[in-house]
Structure formats: structure tokens, C-alpha cells
Amino acid sequence: MESAERLVKNPGWTSRVAQAMRGAGGMLLDLAYPPVCLNCDAPTSTPDVLCAICFKALRPITAPLCPVMGLPFEVSLGPDLLSAEAIADPPPFGRARAAVLYNEVARTLVSRLKYGDRPELARFCARLIAGAGHELWMGDPILVPIPLHPARQRERRYNQSGELAQALGKLTGLDVDADLVRRIRKTRQQVGLSGDGRQRNVAGAFAVHPDMLVRSRGRRIVLVDDVYTTGATTKAVTRTLLKAGAEAVDVVSFARVVIGAELPI
């Protein structure tokens, strides 16, 4: 009886007990399922991280880089120097940034996030994206994930780009609008297609929400994706947004394929 009265008179005590029980349960889970590296499954001290060896194997993309495409340069030749790609084929978006080069470790993370039913991996990837895209967060833009076709999203259970955008929104404090762009045509997967084939594959595949202008309210849009390969998908989405009246679009991704640097996709 005394214990029951204590619960009623001191609800804070109840919450502390519940918190302690949750903590004990967490420790039991850690003992039964100890945290492991997101890439190689080696034991780690905390969950949702890479071990020291795998983390060192990641290739972060840092300055000097192309101010438009975000491609890394070996040496700095000035802040306004553009890459050959940006000069030969100027993109419809303003800037693209990526956290890491697409290599073995990055491929495993993306594959597990995308096809392995591991949405929690988005939290780790988003932490790296938040740093790599820091200059894109100025001016309070809206984060918009590259959409999946509804049928494909049902197959995978979630949109990996949507998970990245939500995790990134929590880290940066930026708004996320997952419904601003829709994929209206189910396309082939881009893996294995040529650059031209990728462009044809996504042509006419996207549409914006009818209230896009109201929802964006003149704010810049930052598209969020897992891997930037040729840019066919992000360029198609960007053109769709600009045609509908968006003022400006930037792009951010976890990994970036750089020809000759690491792995093809």
C-alpha cells in the first residue's frame, strides 16, 4: 500500500524506475547482441558505428573540390576552378556534395541500407553527410529525398533516401518533405546501365506535389540520395522541380562514384 501511495504522490519516482528498467533491459540486449561494426561485423564499443579499421578505409571527400560538382581535386588551383564535368555538361542543380568516395566499405553500407532491411544504418551515414554538406545548410533549405516508386518501396519496406533525409533533418534541424516529389513511373534499377541508358530510364519518371510552391515557400531544396553515380536521377528530379517553379536545387549524397578513383557501380 505504501508503495502504491508513493507512486501516486511522486510520479517522478515512477519515471526514474521505468528509466532504470529500460537501462537494465538495454544492458541485457547488449550482452545478448553486442554491437558490431556496420561493415565487417567485428565487435565495437557502441552500436551503429564502424570499427577503427573500416572507418579508416572510408575515403572522405574534402577540399579542394569542384564548387559545383563536388569532385575532389588532387591540388588546389583556386576556389573558382571548375571540374571538366561541370564545364562540359553543366548540371541543372547548383551544387553537389558527397561524404565519401564509393569504395568497398561504402558499397557495403549502401547495400545493407538499401537492400538489407537495415534502416538504422542511415543514422551513421547521415552523420558523415551532415559534415560534408555543411555549406548547403545555410539559408534554411528543405531536405527532399529522391523518391522510390510505391511498388518498389513496398518491396523494400522503406525508402533508403527517405531514411537518410529524416536522419539528416534531425542532425541539422532542417525540415524534411518526403512527399514533395513522387516517382510516377516504375523504372529499371540504374545499376549496370550506361550514362545515356540511365538518362532514358528516368526520363519523365517524376512529378512534384500540386502544392509544391506553397510547401517550399521559395526556399532552396536539397535533394538527398544514397549514391551519386552519373547524376541522371538527381538531374531528372532537379529539372522536374525547376520546371514546377522551384527557385534553386542542390544535391547531397552519402557516396560519390568517381571514375578511376575506386569502384564502378
Predicted regions and their residues:
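Glycine-rich phosphate/pyrophosphate-handling loop used in enzymes and phosphotransfer proteins
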Residues: 1-265
